[in-house]
Protein backbone atom coordinates (compact mmCIF):
# COMPACT_ATOMS: atom_id res chain seq x y z
CA UNK A 1 0.00 0.00 0.00
CA UNK A 2 1.47 3.35 -0.99
CA UNK A 3 2.03 6.08 1.57
CA UNK A 4 -0.01 9.31 1.46
CA UNK A 5 3.09 11.28 0.50
CA UNK A 6 3.71 9.09 -2.53
CA UNK A 7 0.18 9.81 -3.75
CA UNK A 8 0.75 13.58 -3.77
CA UNK A 9 1.09 15.10 -7.24
CA UNK A 10 4.70 15.60 -8.30
CA UNK A 11 4.08 19.31 -8.93
CA UNK A 12 2.82 19.73 -5.37
CA UNK A 13 5.89 17.99 -3.95
CA UNK A 14 8.15 20.20 -6.05
CA UNK A 15 6.37 23.33 -4.83
CA UNK A 16 6.76 22.28 -1.21
CA UNK A 17 10.44 21.51 -1.76
CA UNK A 18 11.01 24.89 -3.40
CA UNK A 19 9.38 26.66 -0.45
CA UNK A 20 11.52 24.70 1.98
CA UNK A 21 14.69 25.50 0.04
CA UNK A 22 13.77 29.18 -0.14
CA UNK A 23 13.94 29.21 3.64
CA UNK A 24 17.66 28.47 3.32
CA UNK A 25 18.32 31.69 1.39
CA UNK A 26 20.01 34.52 3.26
CA UNK A 27 17.42 37.31 3.66
CA UNK A 28 19.54 39.84 1.75
CA UNK A 29 19.62 37.55 -1.29
CA UNK A 30 15.87 36.98 -1.20
CA UNK A 31 15.45 40.77 -1.23
CA UNK A 32 17.64 41.29 -4.31
CA UNK A 33 16.44 41.61 -7.89
CA UNK A 34 18.45 40.00 -10.67
CA UNK A 35 20.14 42.37 -13.10
CA UNK A 36 18.26 42.36 -16.40
CA UNK A 37 19.40 44.82 -19.10
CA UNK A 38 16.63 46.95 -20.58
CA UNK A 39 16.14 45.74 -24.15
CA UNK A 40 13.11 47.36 -25.79
CA UNK A 41 12.17 46.27 -29.34
CA UNK A 42 13.05 48.33 -32.39
CA UNK A 43 16.44 49.55 -31.19
CA UNK A 44 18.90 50.27 -34.01
CA UNK A 45 21.53 52.20 -32.05
CA UNK A 46 22.72 50.94 -28.65
CA UNK A 47 24.42 53.61 -26.57
CA UNK A 48 23.51 52.21 -23.16
CA UNK A 49 26.23 49.72 -22.14
CA UNK A 50 29.51 51.65 -22.51
CA UNK A 51 30.70 49.22 -25.16
CA UNK A 52 33.29 50.35 -27.69
CA UNK A 53 32.05 50.40 -31.29
CA UNK A 54 33.61 47.96 -33.78
CA UNK A 55 37.26 48.71 -34.46
CA UNK A 56 38.19 50.63 -37.59
CA UNK A 57 41.18 48.29 -37.93
CA UNK A 58 40.94 44.59 -38.84
CA UNK A 59 44.16 43.90 -36.91
CA UNK A 60 42.43 43.24 -33.59
CA UNK A 61 40.06 40.62 -34.97
CA UNK A 62 42.83 39.06 -37.06
CA UNK A 63 45.12 38.75 -34.02
CA UNK A 64 42.34 37.13 -32.00
CA UNK A 65 41.45 34.67 -34.77
CA UNK A 66 45.09 33.62 -35.17
CA UNK A 67 45.47 33.10 -31.43
CA UNK A 68 42.26 31.12 -31.03
CA UNK A 69 43.02 28.90 -34.03
CA UNK A 70 45.90 27.37 -32.10
CA UNK A 71 43.90 26.52 -28.97
CA UNK A 72 43.93 22.90 -27.79
CA UNK A 73 40.22 22.62 -27.06
CA UNK A 74 40.60 19.20 -25.43
CA UNK A 75 42.83 20.63 -22.67
CA UNK A 76 41.96 22.63 -19.58
CA UNK A 77 43.18 26.24 -19.49
CA UNK A 78 46.39 27.33 -17.81
CA UNK A 79 45.13 27.82 -14.23
CA UNK A 80 47.72 30.56 -13.60
CA UNK A 81 47.15 32.39 -16.92
CA UNK A 82 50.92 32.80 -17.11
CA UNK A 83 51.23 34.27 -20.62
CA UNK A 84 48.34 36.65 -20.09
CA UNK A 85 49.79 37.92 -16.82
CA UNK A 86 53.11 38.49 -18.55
CA UNK A 87 51.36 40.43 -21.33
CA UNK A 88 49.50 42.58 -18.79
CA UNK A 89 52.75 43.16 -16.93
CA UNK A 90 54.48 44.39 -20.08
CA UNK A 91 51.65 46.80 -20.88
CA UNK A 92 51.04 48.16 -17.37
CA UNK A 93 54.28 47.67 -15.46
CA UNK A 94 52.59 45.51 -12.84
CA UNK A 95 54.51 42.65 -11.22
CA UNK A 96 52.88 39.37 -12.28
CA UNK A 97 52.78 38.34 -8.61
CA UNK A 98 50.58 41.38 -7.94
CA UNK A 99 47.93 40.35 -10.48
CA UNK A 100 44.67 38.55 -9.72
CA UNK A 101 42.75 37.74 -12.92
CA UNK A 102 39.02 37.18 -13.24
CA UNK A 103 36.13 36.82 -15.65
CA UNK A 104 35.78 40.56 -16.00
CA UNK A 105 36.33 42.81 -13.00
CA UNK A 106 32.97 41.54 -11.70
CA UNK A 107 34.55 38.23 -10.67
CA UNK A 108 37.47 40.02 -9.03
CA UNK A 109 35.02 42.13 -7.02
CA UNK A 110 33.25 38.94 -5.95
CA UNK A 111 36.56 37.37 -4.89
CA UNK A 112 37.45 40.41 -2.80
CA UNK A 113 34.08 40.34 -1.07
CA UNK A 114 34.40 36.62 -0.38
CA UNK A 115 37.91 36.89 1.05
CA UNK A 116 37.73 40.17 2.98
CA UNK A 117 34.56 39.30 4.85
CA UNK A 118 35.51 39.06 8.52
CA UNK A 119 33.31 41.50 10.51
CA UNK A 120 35.31 44.17 12.30
CA UNK A 121 35.09 45.44 15.87
CA UNK A 122 32.37 43.01 16.93
CA UNK A 123 30.15 44.24 14.09
CA UNK A 124 27.39 41.83 13.01
CA UNK A 125 28.55 41.88 9.38
CA UNK A 126 31.34 43.29 7.19
CA UNK A 127 30.87 46.70 5.58
CA UNK A 128 31.55 47.97 2.05
CA UNK A 129 31.65 51.72 1.49
CA UNK A 130 31.14 53.43 -1.87
CA UNK A 131 30.21 56.86 -3.19
CA UNK A 132 26.82 57.24 -4.81
CA UNK A 133 26.01 57.21 -7.65
CA UNK A 134 28.57 54.68 -8.80
CA UNK A 135 28.91 51.24 -10.42
CA UNK A 136 25.84 49.30 -9.25
CA UNK A 137 27.66 45.96 -8.96
CA UNK A 138 29.53 47.14 -5.86
CA UNK A 139 26.30 47.37 -3.90
CA UNK A 140 24.66 44.34 -5.50
CA UNK A 141 27.69 42.09 -4.96
CA UNK A 142 28.23 43.40 -1.44
CA UNK A 143 24.69 42.49 -0.41
CA UNK A 144 24.93 39.12 -2.12
CA UNK A 145 28.07 38.32 -0.13
CA UNK A 146 26.61 39.39 3.19
CA UNK A 147 28.31 42.80 3.44
CA UNK A 148 26.44 45.89 4.56
CA UNK A 149 26.69 48.56 1.84
CA UNK A 150 27.24 52.12 3.03
CA UNK A 151 26.89 54.88 0.44
CA UNK A 152 28.18 58.45 0.63
CA UNK A 153 26.67 60.98 -1.82
CA UNK A 154 29.00 62.72 -4.25
CA UNK A 155 29.05 66.50 -4.08
CA UNK A 156 27.26 68.87 -6.46
CA UNK A 157 30.03 68.49 -9.07
CA UNK A 158 29.96 64.67 -8.82
CA UNK A 159 33.29 64.69 -6.99
CA UNK A 160 34.14 63.03 -3.68
CA UNK A 161 32.92 64.73 -0.52
CA UNK A 162 36.12 64.13 1.42
CA UNK A 163 34.91 65.19 4.85
CA UNK A 164 31.73 63.12 4.65
CA UNK A 165 33.55 60.10 3.21
CA UNK A 166 36.29 60.16 5.86
CA UNK A 167 33.66 60.50 8.57
CA UNK A 168 31.78 57.50 7.16
CA UNK A 169 35.00 55.45 7.10
CA UNK A 170 35.68 56.36 10.72
CA UNK A 171 32.12 55.58 11.83
CA UNK A 172 31.46 52.37 9.88
CA UNK A 173 35.00 50.85 9.69
CA UNK A 174 34.49 49.24 6.28
CA UNK A 175 36.44 46.23 5.08
CA UNK A 176 36.58 47.59 1.52
CA UNK A 177 36.09 51.01 -0.08
CA UNK A 178 35.33 50.91 -3.81
CA UNK A 179 36.15 54.08 -5.76
CA UNK A 180 35.62 54.05 -9.53
CA UNK A 181 37.74 56.75 -11.15
CA UNK A 182 36.70 57.57 -13.83
CA UNK A 183 33.36 56.99 -12.19
CA UNK A 184 30.41 55.17 -13.71
CA UNK A 185 27.83 56.65 -14.36
CA UNK A 186 29.13 60.21 -13.95
CA UNK A 187 32.13 59.78 -16.28
CA UNK A 188 34.44 62.13 -14.40
CA UNK A 189 37.68 61.34 -12.64
CA UNK A 190 37.74 62.30 -8.98
CA UNK A 191 40.12 65.10 -8.08
CA UNK A 192 43.45 63.39 -7.35
CA UNK A 193 43.98 65.23 -4.08
CA UNK A 194 40.53 64.23 -2.82
CA UNK A 195 40.92 60.63 -3.94
CA UNK A 196 44.31 60.27 -2.29
CA UNK A 197 43.05 61.79 0.96
CA UNK A 198 40.22 59.25 1.06
CA UNK A 199 42.34 56.16 0.31
CA UNK A 200 44.96 57.27 2.84
CA UNK A 201 42.39 57.90 5.58
CA UNK A 202 42.62 54.46 7.23
CA UNK A 203 45.40 51.99 6.49
CA UNK A 204 43.34 49.12 7.93
CA UNK A 205 40.81 49.47 5.11
CA UNK A 206 41.40 47.97 1.66
CA UNK A 207 40.69 50.68 -0.90
CA UNK A 208 40.01 49.66 -4.49
CA UNK A 209 40.42 52.26 -7.24
CA UNK A 210 38.50 50.92 -10.21
CA UNK A 211 40.14 52.16 -13.41
CA UNK A 212 37.88 50.37 -15.88
CA UNK A 213 37.75 53.51 -18.05
CA UNK A 214 41.30 54.78 -17.48
CA UNK A 215 42.29 54.27 -21.13
CA UNK A 216 40.02 57.22 -21.95
CA UNK A 217 41.60 59.38 -19.22
CA UNK A 218 45.07 60.78 -18.61
CA UNK A 219 46.85 57.75 -17.19
CA UNK A 220 46.66 55.29 -14.31
CA UNK A 221 47.34 56.14 -10.67
CA UNK A 222 48.80 52.68 -10.01
CA UNK A 223 52.11 54.22 -8.89
CA UNK A 224 50.33 55.12 -5.65
CA UNK A 225 50.74 51.50 -4.56
CA UNK A 226 54.39 52.18 -3.74
CA UNK A 227 53.33 54.46 -0.88
CA UNK A 228 49.87 53.05 -0.17
CA UNK A 229 50.13 49.25 0.13
CA UNK A 230 46.48 48.85 1.15
CA UNK A 231 45.29 50.28 -2.18
CA UNK A 232 44.52 48.04 -5.16
CA UNK A 233 43.64 48.86 -8.77
CA UNK A 234 40.99 47.20 -10.92
CA UNK A 235 41.32 47.09 -14.71
CA UNK A 236 39.41 45.42 -17.54
CA UNK A 237 39.63 44.91 -21.29
CA UNK A 238 35.85 45.19 -21.61
CA UNK A 239 35.71 48.93 -22.31
CA UNK A 240 38.26 49.06 -25.13
CA UNK A 241 36.68 46.85 -27.76
CA UNK A 242 36.92 43.27 -26.50
CA UNK A 243 34.10 42.99 -23.96
CA UNK A 244 33.26 39.51 -25.28
CA UNK A 245 36.47 38.15 -23.74
CA UNK A 246 35.46 39.07 -20.17
CA UNK A 247 38.98 39.63 -18.84
CA UNK A 248 39.66 41.81 -15.80
CA UNK A 249 42.29 42.02 -13.10
CA UNK A 250 43.30 43.44 -9.76
CA UNK A 251 46.76 44.80 -9.10
CA UNK A 252 47.47 44.72 -5.37
CA UNK A 253 50.02 43.71 -2.77
CA UNK A 254 51.36 40.26 -3.77
CA UNK A 255 50.82 38.88 -0.26
CA UNK A 256 47.12 39.79 -0.43
CA UNK A 257 46.81 38.48 -3.98
CA UNK A 258 48.31 35.16 -2.87
CA UNK A 259 45.67 34.81 -0.14
CA UNK A 260 42.72 35.74 -2.36
CA UNK A 261 43.97 33.45 -5.12
CA UNK A 262 43.29 30.51 -2.80
CA UNK A 263 39.54 30.92 -3.35
CA UNK A 264 39.65 31.71 -7.06
CA UNK A 265 38.04 28.87 -8.97
CA UNK A 266 40.59 26.88 -10.98
CA UNK A 267 40.45 27.43 -14.74
CA UNK A 268 38.27 30.51 -14.28
CA UNK A 269 39.57 32.09 -17.50
CA UNK A 270 39.03 29.94 -20.57
CA UNK A 271 41.91 29.14 -22.90
CA UNK A 272 40.10 31.09 -25.63
CA UNK A 273 39.86 34.19 -23.42
CA UNK A 274 43.50 33.89 -22.33
CA UNK A 275 44.80 33.42 -25.87
CA UNK A 276 42.66 36.18 -27.35
CA UNK A 277 43.43 38.71 -24.61
CA UNK A 278 47.15 37.96 -24.85
CA UNK A 279 47.00 38.52 -28.62
CA UNK A 280 45.23 41.85 -28.17
CA UNK A 281 47.84 43.02 -25.66
CA UNK A 282 50.86 41.75 -27.60
CA UNK A 283 49.91 42.12 -31.27
CA UNK A 284 47.13 44.68 -31.59
CA UNK A 285 47.64 47.13 -28.73
CA UNK A 286 48.56 50.04 -31.01
CA UNK A 287 45.32 49.50 -32.92
CA UNK A 288 43.36 49.45 -29.66
CA UNK A 289 44.97 52.73 -28.60
CA UNK A 290 44.16 54.32 -31.97
CA UNK A 291 40.52 53.31 -31.49
CA UNK A 292 40.56 54.82 -27.99
CA UNK A 293 42.07 58.08 -29.29
CA UNK A 294 39.40 58.25 -31.99
CA UNK A 295 36.68 57.74 -29.38
CA UNK A 296 38.14 60.55 -27.26
CA UNK A 297 38.03 62.84 -30.29
CA UNK A 298 34.41 61.89 -31.00
CA UNK A 299 33.65 62.46 -27.32
CA UNK A 300 34.80 66.08 -27.56
CA UNK A 301 32.58 66.66 -30.59
CA UNK A 302 29.55 65.05 -28.97
CA UNK A 303 30.01 67.13 -25.82
CA UNK A 304 29.95 70.32 -27.91
CA UNK A 305 26.84 69.24 -29.82
CA UNK A 306 24.79 68.21 -26.77
CA UNK A 307 25.92 71.12 -24.58
CA UNK A 308 24.70 73.50 -27.29
CA UNK A 309 21.13 72.20 -26.92
CA UNK A 310 18.90 74.40 -24.73
CA UNK A 311 18.73 73.14 -21.15
CA UNK A 312 21.16 70.23 -21.57
CA UNK A 313 24.23 70.09 -19.32
CA UNK A 314 27.14 67.70 -19.91
CA UNK A 315 29.55 66.76 -17.12
CA UNK A 316 33.20 66.78 -18.30
CA UNK A 317 34.00 63.16 -19.18
CA UNK A 318 37.12 61.04 -18.76
CA UNK A 319 35.38 57.89 -20.02
CA UNK A 320 33.74 56.53 -23.17
CA UNK A 321 30.35 57.93 -22.22
CA UNK A 322 28.68 61.19 -21.22
CA UNK A 323 26.67 62.10 -18.13
CA UNK A 324 23.94 64.39 -19.41
CA UNK A 325 21.43 66.45 -17.44
CA UNK A 326 18.19 66.98 -19.33
CA UNK A 327 16.12 70.20 -19.16
CA UNK A 328 13.42 68.42 -17.15
CA UNK A 329 12.82 64.82 -16.10
CA UNK A 330 14.91 62.38 -18.12
CA UNK A 331 12.09 59.88 -18.66
CA UNK A 332 10.36 61.71 -21.56
CA UNK A 333 13.71 62.26 -23.30
CA UNK A 334 14.62 58.60 -22.83
CA UNK A 335 11.25 57.47 -24.20
CA UNK A 336 11.53 59.78 -27.21
CA UNK A 337 14.99 58.40 -28.00
CA UNK A 338 13.69 54.84 -27.76
CA UNK A 339 10.89 55.79 -30.15
CA UNK A 340 13.65 56.89 -32.55
CA UNK A 341 15.39 53.54 -32.13
CA UNK A 342 18.16 54.86 -29.87
CA UNK A 343 18.84 53.26 -26.49
CA UNK A 344 20.71 55.14 -23.76
CA UNK A 345 20.73 54.65 -19.99
CA UNK A 346 18.24 56.62 -17.91
CA UNK A 347 18.42 57.06 -14.15
CA UNK A 348 14.98 58.57 -13.71
CA UNK A 349 13.84 55.63 -11.56
CA UNK A 350 16.51 56.49 -8.98
CA UNK A 351 14.76 59.75 -8.18
CA UNK A 352 16.28 62.85 -6.64
CA UNK A 353 18.94 64.60 -8.68
CA UNK A 354 19.40 61.46 -10.80
CA UNK A 355 15.86 61.79 -12.18
CA UNK A 356 17.13 64.23 -14.82
CA UNK A 357 20.24 62.26 -15.82
CA UNK A 358 21.10 60.16 -18.87
CA UNK A 359 24.27 58.17 -19.49
CA UNK A 360 25.15 58.07 -23.18
CA UNK A 361 27.91 55.90 -24.66
CA UNK A 362 30.16 57.47 -27.28
CA UNK A 363 29.19 55.79 -30.56
CA UNK A 364 30.44 55.95 -34.11
CA UNK A 365 30.21 59.23 -36.01
CA UNK A 366 27.03 57.99 -37.69
CA UNK A 367 25.48 56.92 -34.38
CA UNK A 368 26.44 60.18 -32.68
CA UNK A 369 24.96 62.21 -35.54
CA UNK A 370 21.69 60.28 -35.28
CA UNK A 371 21.63 60.84 -31.51
CA UNK A 372 22.20 64.58 -31.83
CA UNK A 373 19.55 64.89 -34.55
CA UNK A 374 17.06 63.10 -32.32
CA UNK A 375 17.92 65.26 -29.29
CA UNK A 376 17.50 68.41 -31.38
CA UNK A 377 13.99 67.34 -32.33
CA UNK A 378 13.22 66.55 -28.70
CA UNK A 379 14.62 69.89 -27.49
CA UNK A 380 12.39 71.98 -29.78
Residue spans of the language-model regions?
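N-terminal "arm"/small-domain region of PLP-dependent enzymes with the aminotransferase-like
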Residues: 2-75, 86, 90, 173
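Conserved PLP-binding catalytic core of the aspartate aminotransferase-like
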Residues: 154, 295-296, 306-340
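Conserved PLP cofactor-binding pocket of PLP-dependent enzymes
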Residues: 27-29, 34, 316-317, 324, ...
